[in-house]
Amino acid sequence: MARHSFIQMSKLPNVKGRISYITSHARQENLYATYRTADNAFWNNLARESRQEFQRSGAEGKCIEARELIIALPEVYTQYEPQQVLEDFTDEFRRRYGVECVSALHHNKRKTNYHICLLYTS
């Protein structure tokens, strides 16, 4: 039975923690590939500057440091090399929207299709 792809978006108040979680083989049982368009220093600076700007603004609630898309891919993508799928998708997203990204390619629990966790600057 063919399944449809879907996208879920979340706001991230702790981008460094989320990067650690989605890219960790110890925490992700079905992790096949990871990819970054910027190094750790970039993400550390982004988190620090976002928190500083949030404090200066006096806004209520949580500071949003980045955003995440969880994208379920059609089953046909399991036929392709995982690292290449992830890099092609992430590079196109970066080119199209002009944002830095961290991404990880996982299988769903039933191992029927891949999904990409894509963190990006907002």
Predicted regions and their residues:
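N-terminal nicking endonuclease/strand-transfer module with a His-rich metal-binding environment
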Residues: 1-122
